[in-house]
């Protein structure tokens, strides 16, 4: 199983890292490392994230790297990270193509 970002998911992740980096480079590195560790775990356990409570009928799951939520979908042998949202935000319905 491979973990990949959709273009919009990658853009959002990089924007978050850049935002944190402006004020606290060490925190940005820690966040990026924690995210990589959590996402790497999905390679072996793709169903380990919880179903999105806001969209229980959709085929999306999430893993949390506080305070951010990584939304993903398993398609074949790939885990697609489709969105990254701050936990305080109300998410929009994720889309695979993003």
Model-flagged regions — what are they?
Residues 2-60, 78, 92, 96-98:
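Basic, Lys/Arg-enriched alpha-helical interface segments
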Residues 65-98:
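Enriched for short, Lys/Arg-rich terminal
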